[in-house]
Amino acid sequence: MSGGKGKAGTSEKASTSRSAKAGLTFPVGRVHRLLRKGNYAQRIGSGAPVYLTSVLEYLAAEILELAGNAARDNKKSRIIPRHLQLAIRNDEELNKLLGDVTIAQGGVLPNIHQNLLPKKSGKGGVKASQEL
């Protein structure tokens, strides 16, 4: 019989975060706290912040992957807002999701209307407008 107070014979196990249990990088605890503080509902279930965190992490990973590809296409090693804009606007589903979102310093997609492009001329034919 051991003397003193406390738990005898048990070793303390390090606590595992809910993010680690779910295999996520984003913080489940912080999302849960923000859901509670935001007055979205009177009560928040234990699975809701895990699900929401996983959705947020997936969306962030998807956007960052496409933005990284856009940066690599432009021979840059750092993602800037322009790359985020190009990634989102060139992806049909992300463009639909973030259609009303304005990205600061994002610029616009390069687009020239078909009517403004020069006309394709036939072989050897001289245009009437160039004859004098």
UniProtKB/Swiss-Prot annotation:
Residues 1-21 are annotated as: Disordered. Phosphorylated to form H2AS128ph (gamma-H2A) in response to DNA double-strand breaks (DSBs) generated by exogenous genotoxic agents and by stalled replication forks. Phosphorylation is dependent on the DNA damage checkpoint kinases MEC1/ATR and TEL1/ATM, spreads on either side of a detected DSB site and may mark the surrounding chromatin for recruitment of proteins required for DNA damage signaling and repair. Gamma-H2A is removed from the DNA prior to the strand invasion-primer extension step of the repair process and subsequently dephosphorylated. Acetylated by ESA1 to form H2AK4ac and H2AK7ac. InterPro entries: Histone-fold (IPR009072), Histone_H2A (IPR002119), Histone_H2A/H2B/H3 (IPR007125), Histone_H2A_C (IPR032454), Histone_H2A_CS (IPR032458). The record marks 119 as: Not ubiquitinated. The modification Phosphoserine is found at residue 129. SMART domains: H2A (SM00414). GO terms for biological process: DNA repair; heterochromatin formation. The modification N-acetylserine is found at residue 2. Transmembrane segments: none annotated. Keywords: Acetylation, Chromosome, DNA damage, DNA repair, DNA-binding, Methylation, Nucleosome core, Nucleus, Phosphoprotein. The modification N5-methylglutamine is found at residue 105. One of its GO terms (cellular component) is nucleosome. It holds the Pfam family Histone. PROSITE patterns: HISTONE_H2A. GO terms for molecular function: DNA binding; protein heterodimerization activity; structural constituent of chromatin. The modification N6-acetyllysine is found at residues 5, 7. It comes from the Eukaryota. A motif ([ST]-Q motif) lies at residues 129-130. Its main location: nucleus. The [ST]-Q motif constitutes a recognition sequence for kinases from the PI3/PI4-kinase family. The nucleosome is a histone octamer containing two molecules each of H2A, H2B, H3 and H4 assembled in one H3-H4 heterotetramer and two H2A-H2B heterodimers. The octamer wraps approximately 147 bp of DNA. In contrast to vertebrates and insects, its C-terminus is not monoubiquitinated. Core component of nucleosome which plays a central role in DNA double strand break (DSB) repair. Nucleosomes wrap and compact DNA into chromatin, limiting DNA accessibility to the cellular machineries which require DNA as a template. Histones thereby play a central role in transcription regulation, DNA repair, DNA replication and chromosomal stability. DNA accessibility is regulated via a complex set of post-translational modifications of histones, also called histone code, and nucleosome remodeling. PANTHER family: HISTONE H2A. Belongs to the histone H2A family. This is Histone H2A.1. It comes from Candida albicans (strain SC5314 / ATCC MYA-2876) (Yeast).
